[in-house]
C-alpha cells in the first residue's frame, strides 16, 4: 500500500498540498477566474476612464499643474491620470505631494518612479468615489 501511494505521489507535481496551497486559496482562485471571465470588460474600462476624468476635472486648470489621461490600451493599467507639477509655480514638488498624501488622513500611498517627472494615478485599486478624495486631496496640497 505505501509503495503504491509513494509511486503514484511522485508523479504529481501540480498545485495543491505540494505547494502549500489550501482549499480556501483554491476556491479563491476559481472564484476570481470565474469573475474575470464573466465580467463585462467594456463597462469596467469605461468606468475607469470616466473616474480618471473626474480627477482630471478636479486638477485641471490649476496653475503649474498638468494632468492628462493615461490611455495605454495595451498595458495592464489602460487608464489613469498622469500628473506633472511645476515646482516653481506650485511651491510643492511631486515628492512633497507623495509624502503629504501618505501622512494625511486617510493615508494615500502614491509614488514617483525614479527618473520620471510625473506621478501616475491608477484607478483600479480605488473604490467608487475614492478618486474624488484623491483628486481633492492633491488639489488642497497645490493651492
Report each predicted region and the residues it spans.
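Conserved C-terminal alpha-helix-loop-beta "cap" of PLP-dependent enzymes
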Residues: 56-140
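Active-site C-terminal subdomain of aminotransferase-like
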Residues: 1-76
